[in-house]
From Swiss-Prot:
GO terms for biological process: glycogen biosynthetic process. The keyword Cytoplasm does not apply. This is Glycogen synthase. It catalyses: [(1->4)-alpha-D-glucosyl](n) + ADP-alpha-D-glucose = [(1->4)-alpha-D-glucosyl](n+1) + ADP + H(+). Keywords: Glycogen biosynthesis, Glycosyltransferase, Transferase.
Length: 476
């Protein structure tokens, strides 16, 4: 079974969000199941030179893009037993950021065509082409509409994964006419047209043999208007080929037993070492070293999607509790400034790190007691999974993958691995925080809850099995 992942980012090469984590971890787990997964991505200038040096030039071809041919170098390398192909074109990929450029429509039109033009030159017979998010959605669309009549492509099946429906790749109509050489028949509501523009993600949904969302709850949510980002009707139409498979975490990276970034390694049977991580975190931020004061942390993009309006509304009420709060992340200036002001107002209780620091993030996961994730929507979420693996109990809103992975503690049965609330309401969140703090001070209950959180399986194993079955069903 030969699978080609077409992605715009991938760990360890380059990362801007959770897509890169998925693209880095899932293929390794599929390989353990006997699936040959290879990955194709742009050769960004942002990729560390050490990784670029590990690749060799495999082939040079031309990619037709509208009226011109564009250079395409195919670089080939291997990391952790996985083969990678990097599409080299400095004009499109020598930039200071992955996305957000005026010509993103052209850049990823080129990349989509380059993926397809490369397939005959990879020395790899592709059974399933698996594209991800808007950046590579048009790979599947172009395969069906322009390449499938060619014997080299006719047997290839397609899977398309929606990691975040909010980002759809919407561009002016000229993209399909000038770059992709698609005629007027593709610019209408049953095809790529979207409120007067062209929508790449829509193309991926229409053309793919199977569509996956990154959690079962998110798969259901995106078929409703509130979450559907104006594609809910289309997703309801194609519901029969839509499924939800929850993401996992890479346990070779996020594992408190082996994590070299944290002060003291530990497992569910050595939680006293977790306390050492808490003291180290308090020392790092200059917080009072109070063992019985819970640390509530957030490691997040500081955006509206992450539920920060709820946090902002009741933050001073949270501060009335005997708690310490650590925020690690960056994003919208209004939230950055708010948390910096709170750190100024509550210097003994609140600390903020604007930006991202991988080593510090691991220490925050290991040293905190509670992890707050009150998202407005959350396709899957990785933060809560990492927190659970480190015995840091999540407080989440019941949406998307948060609903699938965090089960609210039931004091009657003792079951659960976290705390959750249903409505997007600041005082519902506040009540849930109060409830979590109450159980934190009941040490036997808390220790059992932490052990339950840490002993569940958050790896990619079950998800990889589900993807393998999906691929298999397409090939039968």
């Amino acid at each position: 079974m030969n699978i080609l992942f077409a992605v715009s980012e991938c760990v360890p090469f380059v990362k801007s969000g959770g897509l890169a984590d998925v693209a880095g971890a899932l293929p390794k787990e599929l390989k353990k199941l006997g699936v040959d997964v290879r990955i194709i991505l742009p050769n960004y200038s942002l990729i560390p030179q050490k990784l670029r040096d590990g690749c060799t030039l495999h082939k040079v071809i031309n990619v037709p893009l509208g009226w011109r041919n564009q250079y395409c170098g195919i670089l080939k390398g291997e990391q952790d037993g996985i083969t990678y192909y990097l599409i080299d074109n400095e004009y499109y990929f020598k930039r200071d950021s992955l996305y957000g450029h005026y010509d993103d429509g052209e850049r990823f039109s080129y990349f989509s065509k380059a993926v397809l033009e490369c397939i005959p030159h990879l020395d790899f017979e592709v059974d399933v082409l698996h594209s991800h998010d808007w950046h590579t959605a048009m790979v599947n669309f172009l395969l069906r509409e322009k390449y499938q009549d060619n014997p080299l492509y006719e047997r290839i099946k397609t899977v398309y994964t929606i990691h975040n429906l909010q980002f759809q790749g919407v561009f002016p109509p000229e993209v399909i006419y000038d770059l992709l050489e698609l005629g007027d028949e593709y610019f209408h509501s049953e095809q790529l047209e979207f409120y007067g523009n062209v929508n790449f993600m829509k193309g991926g949904i229409i053309a793919s043999d199977q569509i996956t969302a990154v959690s079962p709850t998110y798969k259901e949510e995106i078929q409703y208007e509130f979450f559907g980002e104006k594609l809910d009707g289309l997703l309801r139409k194609y519901n029969d080929k839509l499924s939800g498979i929850v993401n996992g975490i890479d346990t070779s990276v996020y594992n408190p037993e082996t994590d070299s970034y944290i002060k003291a390694q530990y497992d569910a049977e050595s939680l006293y070492e977790k306390s050492e991580n808490k003291r180290a975190l308090q020392r790092y931020f200059g917080l009072p070293e109070k063992e019985d004061t819970p640390i509530i942390s957030m490691v997040t993009r500081l955006t509206k999607q992450k539920g920060l309006d709820l946090v902002r509304t009741v933050f001073r009420e949270i501060m009335e509790e005997d708690v310490q709060c650590i925020i690690l992340g960056s994003g919208d200036s209004e939230y950055e400034q708010f948390f910096e002001w709170m750190a100024y107002e509550y210097p003994e209780k609140v600390k903020v790190y604007i930006g991202f620091n991988e080593e510090l993030a691991h220490q925050v996961y290991a040293g905190s007691d509670l992890f707050l994730m009150p998202s407005l929507f959350e396709p899957c979420g990785l933060g809560q999974l990492i927190a659970l693996a480190y015995g840091t109990i999540p407080i989440v809103r019941e949406t998307g993958g948060l609903n699938d992975t965090v089960h609210s503690y039931d004091e009657e049965t003792g079951e659960g691995n976290g705390f959750s609330f249903t409505n997007f309401n600041a005082h519902d969140m506040l009540h849930t925080i109060h409830r979590a703090i109450e159980f934190y001070h009941d040490k036997p209950v808390w220790e059992q809850l932490v052990k339950q959180a840490m002993t569940e399986d958050y790896s990619w194993e079950q998800s990889a099995l589900a993807y393998k079955e999906l691929y298999k069903s397409l090939m039968e």
